[in-house]
C-alpha cells in the first residue's frame, strides 16, 4: 500500500511538471553559398540558423533547459549574464577590395582583424556582467577573450543599433586585433550545431583547408526575433572563406601541369613560362574547393535546397545530394562599391604620429557615414587637431559634422573612442586627419616581441542612405604602430656577462677563503734509522770529536 502511494505521488509530480513547463518550439536551417571571383578564387559561406521560442510571454527562453536544437551552453551564458543580444566576429586575413570588390553580405557578418565582441545587456554600469560574459565566452570558444577589460571596452552610440530596443540596456564593444583565429576556435563552433560535423554542409569543412585560405571569418549572432521580448530568439552562425583553388590543388597533390596550346609550341619559349595548372578555368567543383563531397543531409534541417551557387545575376539552387555534380561558373566581379575606405598611419618619430582615413563615395546619391575609431590608452588622440578635407579643400569641421561622441582616455584604465557622423556628397573624396601621441609604457607593461609594434584596431565605417537604412559596414585594415621600446637585449647581455665573470672568479676566491694551508711533511721524517745509518752516524760523530 505504501509502495502504491509513492508511485501515485511520483506520477502526480510528473503530471504537474508537464502542465506547468513551458513548451519550446525549435527550428534549424542550414545553407551553403558559393560564388566564384575568378579562375583562382572562390568565396564560400556556411550559414546555420537555430530558432527557439516559448509560449510564455513573460519569461526568457534562455531560462529554459529542455532544448533539443538550441545549444544549452549559449542559453546559460545569456541567462546568467543578463544578455539580450550578443554578436561575435573572428577574422583573419585581409579582404581584397580591388579584386574581390564588395565585402560579403555588405560586411554585416564579418569583422576586422582578430576578435570583436559586442552585446546588449541589462543595466550594467560597473561592467560586472560584461566581464563575466567575456570570461565565459573565452572558455566556450577557446579564445583569449578574458583579456577584455575596461581598458579596451567601449560604448558606441551610433555604429551598432540593436535589433530591437530594450529599456535600460547597456551596450559594450571590445576588440582584440592581436588575437589569432585558429582551429581551437573553429572546433567549439561545431559542437553548437545539432548535427555537429557528422552530416549536412558542416561535413565539408576541414580545419586545415579552412585556415589555409587567403581570408576566413566566422560570426555568432544571438538576437531576439520579437520587440521587447526574449520569448523568441534566433542564433546564427556564419563561416566564410575565400578559397585559393590553385593552392588547394597543390595541397591535394593531384595538380598536373600541361603546356597551353596557344604559344608553348615554340621551341624557343622558356618551359617555365608554359606551365599551367590542370584545374579548369571555366568552372569549379565542390571537390576543387573542399577535397570531399558532403555526407548525408542533416535530418534536423527543415530545408531541402541546401546549396546556392551564384551564376551572374541569378542564384542557382541545388540540394545537398546534387553537390558532387555542381559546377560553379567562373564570373567576373562587378565594381559596385557603396563606399571605399583607406586608412594610413604616419610615424613622426617615436613620440608623435598622425592618422588619415580616406573615404570615397562613388555613387550618385549622398551617403551618411558613421566613422568609429577606437584606440588603446597609450595612444592619445588630440581632438583639436581633427581636420576634414573635401575634394582637396579643407572645410570647417563644426559645420560639417552632424554628431560627435568622444570618450577620452583614462590613463591605464580606458582607451579613446570617437564616433563621427557626417554626410558625404556623391562622387566626393573625403579625408579625416588627426594627430596622436604615443605614451611610453612601464617596463612590465610591454608585451612579448614589443619591437614588432602594436596592432591598432580597424576603424569601422557604417554607411546609411537617405532613409537612415544601414547599407553596409566596412572595416579598414589594422595598423601597426611603433612606440618607444627599450633595448631588452642590453640588460640580458649585461646579466650574462656579469654572471660569467662572477662564476670564473668566485671559484678561486672561495677556494682561497675556505682552504687551510698546512706544510707538507717528508715521507722519511718519521721512519726509524737503519743499523747501517746508526753506524755511519757514530763513525762521523767520533771523527768530529
Swiss-Prot record:
Residue intervals annotated with topology Cytoplasmic = 515-545
What residue range is the signal peptide?
Answer: 1-22
Q: Which residues cross the membrane?
A: 494-514
* UniProt keyword Transmembrane helix, yes or no: yes
Q: One short Pfam family name for this protein?
A: Gpi16
Keywords, ordered alphabetically: Disulfide bond, Endoplasmic reticulum, Glycoprotein, GPI-anchor biosynthesis, Membrane, Signal, Transmembrane, Transmembrane helix
Q: Which residues are glycosylated?
A: 168, 227, 336, 391, 467
Which of the residues are on side Lumenal? 23-493
Q: Cite a single GO BP annotation.
A: attachment of GPI anchor to protein
Q: How does it sit in the membrane?
A: Single-pass type I membrane protein
- How does it get modified post-translation? The disulfide bond between PIGK/GPI8 and PIGT is important for normal enzyme activity.
Q: Which domain of life is it from?
A: Eukaryota
Stored InterPro entries: PIG-T (IPR007245)
Q: Which GO terms describe its cellular component?
A: endoplasmic reticulum; GPI-anchor transamidase complex
Question: In terms of one coarse class, where is the protein primarily found?
Answer: endoplasmic reticulum
Q: In which pathway does it act?
A: Glycolipid biosynthesis; glycosylphosphatidylinositol-anchor biosynthesis
Q: Which family does it belong to?
A: Belongs to the PIGT family.
Subunit and interaction comment: Forms a complex with PIG-S homolog, PIG-U homolog and GPI8.
User: PANTHER family, alphabetically?
Assistant: GPI TRANSAMIDASE COMPONENT PIG-T, GPI TRANSAMIDASE COMPONENT PIG-T-RELATED
Protein name (Swiss-Prot/TrEMBL) = GPI transamidase component PIG-T homolog
Tell me the gene name: gpi16
